[in-house]
Amino acid sequence: MYLTKEEELILAGEYGYALQKAMEILVALGDIYGADRLIPIKSAQVAGVSYKNIGDAGIEFLRDFVEAGAKVSVYTTLNPAGIGDDEFMEKQMEVLELYRKMGIEVTSTCTPYYGANLPKFGDHIAWSESSAVSFANSILGARTNREGGPSSLAAAIVGKTPNYGLHLDENRKATVIVDVKAKVKTFADYSVLGYHVGKTLGNDVPYFKNLKPEKTEFLKELGAAMGATGSIALYHVEGETPEYREAITDKLETITVEDSDLKAVRESFQDDWSDIDMILIGCPHASLPEVKEIAELLRMRGKPLKIPLFITASRAVKALADALGYTEIIERYNGKIIPDSCFVVSPIKGWYRGIATNSGKSAFYFRSFGFSVRLDDVENLIKEAP
């Protein structure tokens, strides 16, 4: 991989240990993936935030960078943090403080685009959360690979990333056409579709036909579910996403999605309400319109839920919900908005037995953790819940 004179000096340690170590990570990645050079990035989004995921070894890794004086050189935000007991939270707060000392904005969310970290079409970025990567690539038309925590941090420190993968035009072309014959209209429909397609395709770049999403949130959930059951980091939707016109250049294989395919997924996540003791919405983190809808549905229900309803959202969305009165309504009916956190990366085994959710991503992970899972649209969950 070609390096400029300045980049060579960084790699040689002339600009300090922190930049040298970050550059070593980027050069290793570039060599592995055959990148021709490093390219500047506009922003970064760093995973490896929950203490559940990184442990003490991760804290030592971050501490080494901080003690070497590492500072990020582009606007950088974090993935959600975990929540747990007092001992866990002490470690979790240490992780956040280490990131803060590197100049990272400690807003811990998988939807940074609902706040200040909103890239423009064509921007090169280095993001690591799978659903955020999918949203940035597919809906915003920005360009990022699905980075790991260390590589996104290294890119944030250096301000550059290796030029390979989805940064290149040729790798953003569709590799398979997905002809959707099934009826797909609601949030949960898109969630189930994403679950099925991710599991079926793995790491392709799908081009969807016959989808007419009413809300951007539907596409957010489609990408999140595909990123959970597969490794899909970019997709195109005919007539909807910004790069669909240039996405097909060759004759491609077509797969068809029928109602029966989605029915099979739904039926696999229909555990009885007697096994469910929590409703979880906000995977990826909920938007303000999603929070508003939940407040309205709870008000229509007219009586408090007997099991808790947790909504995970970014700090920015929570602040708006507070100001607009949605939070007060939600709390009146046994709900709570939890900012900057994620139950998937929290040690909650033993706290609850089963979850009800509208998220295919949540359904996938919590089933793998051994929880009972019920998957449906939030309207039905709030209406049917005890």
Swiss-Prot record:
It holds the Pfam family AcnX. InterPro entries: PMDh-L-like_dom (IPR007506). It catalyses: (R)-5-phosphomevalonate = (2E)-3-methyl-5-phosphooxypent-2-enoate + H2O. GO terms for biological process: isoprenoid biosynthetic process. It is an enzyme of class 4 (lyase). One of its GO terms (molecular function) is metal ion binding. Keywords: 4Fe-4S, Iron, Iron-sulfur, Isoprene biosynthesis, Lyase, Metal-binding. Pathway: Isoprenoid biosynthesis; isopentenyl diphosphate biosynthesis via mevalonate pathway. [4Fe-4S] cluster binds at residues 110, 283, 342. Its EC number is 4.2.1.182. Its cofactor is [4Fe-4S] cluster. (R)-5-phosphomevalonate binds at residues 48-50, 53, 63, 79-80, 129-130, 361. The keyword Transferase does not apply. Binds 1 [4Fe-4S] cluster per subunit. The crystal structure contains a [3Fe-4S] cluster and corresponds to the inactive form. The active enzyme probably contains a [4Fe-4S] cluster under anaerobic conditions. Belongs to the AcnX type II large subunit family. Heterodimer composed of a large subunit (PMDh-L) and a small subunit (PMDh-S). Component of a hydro-lyase that catalyzes the dehydration of mevalonate 5-phosphate (MVA5P) to form trans-anhydromevalonate 5-phosphate (tAHMP). Involved in the archaeal mevalonate (MVA) pathway, which provides fundamental precursors for isoprenoid biosynthesis, such as isopentenyl diphosphate (IPP) and dimethylallyl diphosphate (DMAPP). This is Phosphomevalonate dehydratase large subunit. It comes from Thermococcus kodakarensis (strain ATCC BAA-918 / JCM 12380 / KOD1).
